[in-house]
Each structure stands twice: as C-alpha cells, then as structure tokens.
C-alpha cells in the first residue's frame, strides 16, 4: 500500500504479477498449478486473451485511476476493487453478454452491468491525461490522420429500413467513425474526435468537424491516405509525383497508424457488431484508445518512420 495525497486517499498499488494473478486465478479460474507450470510469456498471453492488454499495462492504469488529477477519472477508495476493474476490461476485450458475465464473474447482472460501465467510464476519462495535443510542434509535418470505422447495430429510421447516415462504405453496414491523429515522431495519440456517423466520408469529417481548422491555426500539416485528397494546405496524401524517399515516408507513416488501429481492433467490443447505444460506444471506443495509448508507451512503441537512406 502506498499513501497518496489526502484528497486521493490510500492508494492500492498492484504489481503486474498481482494483476495477472487476480485475472487468471480469481476471475478466469486457472488453477495455481497450471499458472506455475507455464512460462511467464504464456501466462501474459493468456491474460491478454481475456483482458486485451498485459498485466503491466493494467497495473499502470490501475495506479493512475487512483492518483490522477482528472477528477472524472479518479476512483475513490471505497470503489477500488481490482476484480471489478478487470471485469470491465474483460468487457472491452471479449464483449460478453450479461448472461455470460454473470456466470463467469459470479455477480448479478445488475451489479455486473453497473461496475463494468463505472470502470469503463473512469478509464475513458483518462483521455484528458493521455490523449494530449502538444503546446508546440517540432516540425511542420506533425501527425497522421485517419478515420476508424466500427460496426454497430442498425439504427432505427422513421422511413427506411436502413439509415443512410450510418452506412459505412468500409463495411457495407451501419457504423460509427472516430478521427484519430498520431504524432509522426512519438508514440502518442494527439487527437481523438467522434463519434461521427459513417455516412460522411473521412474527408468531409476532416473539413467540417475534424482537425483541419486546428492544423491550419497551428501552422502544421498531417499525412493521410487517398481519401483526404484535395486539402493540400492541411494534409498531404500519396502522390505519383512524390520522390522515392517521400513516397516511402508517407507509406511508413500510414502503416504506423494502421498498426495502432490494429491494436484497438484487437478488442472485440470494437471489432464486431456493437450492440449497445451510441453513448456506450463512445465509452468503449475512448476507453480502448486510452488503453492502447498505455500499450504504446509502456511496451509496444510504434516504429520509427524515418529509416537510413530514406532521403539519399
């Protein structure tokens, strides 16, 4: 136990090993012998299969939820139950039904639902601490920008069986979209805007609700895929006239963003059909983005874009 400030109360620090034990033994139900027989790498992979990120990541998140200065994210002492916290992370990773959660965690549907959303909302609120727009930029080329579409249940429309505002051209189904921006030179998500209906393409979102005006105001530029063509003052896209070095730079930058998108889609709540409300989608998407930001900070840094000889 570690004593924090008076406002934060007594902080319950858990090591990655303790987090893993709670997850595998007390929640998932692995026997002590099975855990001991396996290598640490195997147990970490088991844990990630149920909770989405490693014990080291969740140990850091758990500590920050108690120490953060973000009031909306701070968990008061009476609510600091690591089992409930991991139950919420399991919801993000495996997206179980309430019946499945009730059986797995031996908790009533009502209490399971309440504690899941409580901790998901707390992790989501850490975005104010983890998803940060820098005060200044070191280079005019600052970030990549991309829209991430997720499949959601079909929204009711008063006339048609399908609402065209929600139609995702990526999935051919109803969807919601977030605009994400990632620093070109750091493992850092710098902006997360949404959710938007997927009827509007990424380019339209960018100029009407997204980052374009902020980029212009700061005098910086982004790199985007071909869907952002036509906004040369704020975003650069792949161009047949690019030199070999510039072409490689843009390609690696976009693949780097795809790497982060892939981390997020590793969570079943975002990779399959989302069956809850739009508000709950916002909770889940932003919480997962925060968790993935911890991942790239702690153990999975995004690769460097610039390689030797790129601009020779």
What are these regions (language model features)?
Residues 90-91:
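Short helix-to-turn junction characteristic of helix-turn-helix DNA-binding domains
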